[in-house]
């Protein structure tokens, strides 16, 4: 669950977000470039400071907590993989910076890797993977963290339409199985219509709910 009523100031505009998102809801975030879509996700994740207001995640006040203390995983358009680490290590680092996983954590890693189709690539380096495979690694790292809130900031926009659909279907499956709360920033609304519960548009510094075209 996400509840926020916050204000964030840029030099030329003040953003006021007032949202209540229920457990397990899947929300598409739309708006023109520069409207504040990424800022909304960064506020929830703790990467941007709140000027005033409150952010509550899963019933707890996280307005000023550090990003690593929040029940949130976030995936950006850039996959942010470490080029010198293997796929296994790039996934594992989402749990532990020293890569020293317990037996149970290793089992979970292997389970997530299998779910995203990476079982045969765990020993490879990112340079040996396709763009779609690299995004699967980044997604696996998010899912392994097993946080109840998943934030996606156009992570698949650089992929071709077929690969985007594959990734979106995979996300939809995980959200249903784990009852994850999802916020997805997208410019391809038609591709996610059948996978979301609500649309929120960021415009003129405000977050407004829009009707889903069916």
From Swiss-Prot:
Belongs to the ABC transporter superfamily. Thiamine importer (TC 3.A.1.19.1) family. Its main location: membrane. ATP binds at residues 31-38. Keywords: ATP-binding, Cell inner membrane, Cell membrane, Membrane, Nucleotide-binding, Translocase, Transport. This is Thiamine import ATP-binding protein ThiQ. Its EC number is 7.6.2.15. It comes from Histophilus somni (strain 129Pt). It is an enzyme of class 7 (translocase). The keyword Transport applies. Coiled coil: none annotated.
